[in-house]
A protein has these predicted regions:
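N-terminal capping segment at the start of a domain
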Residues: 1-25, 31-33, 37, 139-145, ...
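Short secondary-structure junctions
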Residues: 38-45, 237-248
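Acidic/histidine-rich catalytic neighborhood of metal-dependent amide-processing enzymes
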Residues: 108-229, 249-252, 256-258
Length: 268
């Protein structure tokens, strides 16, 4: 499984996948690669707040395992995206500090406007306007140019697994690259609604930010732990790298697996 080769190619050709054009070009690339490997692949549209365009390789309804990742890349406002899935107190502390910075960035200009104008209308308009601007920048603002970890790494993990299974083309495995994870897990939400049985019964292995770290972290929900008790050991043997298991119920990992009952989050 040559993940590094995929990483070099995808990062060189499609480092940012945020605009409609960028995402369309990347979808065409993946569909072509899947077809070259001999897979049946398609773009599947769904509606969940907005139109989402997922890349589906194989049959979601017949598969016993879905291997997934999101292919869209985030915006940036200069604040770090800190992931501490196994350390809830530190995770909440970091999130609180980031929220504090955002509050300061909103309220200092608002205070200046209030002092200069003395107008309640101008003050409230500034407050609301800055808040809306901050939310826009977080969701649809300046594209982050550095996306190797989030989530070119996960995308390339899926592509590498597709390549490794290409000779067998097992019917029980399907691959999905989700759209609009960065806008609120929307692509995964739409797919789960369109494939309700799969959302309840199919094991989902979702790779998000797997590019940094010496070990694989698998966050497994209770339903998946009960149905697949040997999941961790199987992952260790097949991957050849250290695997750390965590209980999803005790961790923080907001990614596409949240829309699936047997959704396993995988990061590094």
């Amino acid at each position: 499984m040559n993940t590094n080769r995929w990483m070099q190619e995808v990062n060189a050709r499609f480092p940012v996948r945020k605009s409609k054009v960028q995402k369309a070009q990347f979808r065409q690339y993946v569909l072509q690669k899947a077809q070259e490997m001999g897979y049946a692949a398609r773009m599947e549209e769904n509606k969940a707040i907005c139109t989402n365009r997922n890349i589906v390789v194989g049959d979601v309804d017949k598969a016993k395992v879905l291997v997934t990742a999101h292919y869209d890349t985030p915006a940036t406002v200069g604040l770090p995206n800190v992931m501490l899935p196994m350390n809830r107190p530190m995770f909440y502390l970091v999130q609180a500090l980031i929220a504090l910075v955002m509050v300061v960035l909103i309220f200092i200009p608002t205070g200046i406007v209030k002092k200069l104008t003395g107008s309640i209308f101008c003050t409230e308009a500034t407050l609301i306007g800055l808040y809306c601007l901050m939310m826009y920048l977080l969701l649809a603002g300046v594209p982050n140019p550095h996306n190797v970890n989030d989530n070119t790494s996960g995308v390339c993990g899926v592509l590498a697994l597709m390549e490794s299974f290409a000779a067998e083309k097992p019917e029980k495995i399907a691959f999905v690259l989700f759209d609009n994870e960065e806008k609120g897990l929307l692509g995964a939400s739409g797919l789960a609604k369109a494939h309700k049985q799969a959302a309840k019964e199919t094991l989902v292995l979702n790779m998000d930010c797997i590019g940094v770290g010496e070990a694989m972290l698998m966050l497994v929900p209770k339903a998946a732990r009960e149905k697949y008790p040997a999941l961790g050991e199987t992952a260790r043997k097949s991957s050849g790298i250290p695997v750390v298991l965590g209980n999803m119920e005790k961790c923080n990992f907001s990614s596409d697996q949240k829309h699936f009952k047997l959704g396993v989050g995988i990061c590094a």
